[in-house]
């Protein structure tokens, strides 16, 4: 299972991946206007920033080595049934970690369906 958690509130020591802006998986979009962030682009609000990250994910995966490697490391652990922890600062608010989680869950489901289709 993939868990997205707030690093200010929880700590996990195994299969933990930091996904904040200082990492290859960080969201380059921010809704925050009153303080400095490492974000490159301004979004209207939190939902806009996360929706844009979903598109960004699709653009980066396969075209950016650091991004793709990080996603693949997470996915390989998740695929084996290991619990994986995505560490951010947003939770319990909506977070780009939710996008990462959804994309990886969809990928695994697609692979399982394809495997079953091959066996028919």
Predicted regions and their residues:
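Catalytic phosphate/metal-binding cores of nucleic-acid and nucleotide-processing enzymes, i.e., regions
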Residues: 1-120
């Amino acid at each position: 299972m993939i868990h997205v958690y707030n690093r200010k509130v929880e700590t996990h020591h195994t299969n933990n991946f930091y996904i904040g802006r200082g990492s290859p998986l960080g969201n380059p979009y921010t809704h925050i206007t009153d303080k400095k962030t490492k974000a490159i682009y301004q979004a209207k609000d939190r939902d806009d920033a996360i929706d844009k990250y979903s598109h960004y994910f699709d653009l980066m995966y396969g075209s950016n080595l650091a991004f793709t490697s990080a996603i693949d490391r997470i996915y390989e652990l998740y695929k084996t049934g290991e619990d994986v922890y995505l560490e951010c600062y947003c939770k319990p608010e909506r977070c780009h970690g939710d996008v990462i989680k959804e994309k990886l869950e969809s990928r695994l489901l697609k692979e399982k369906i394809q495997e079953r289709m091959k066996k028919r």
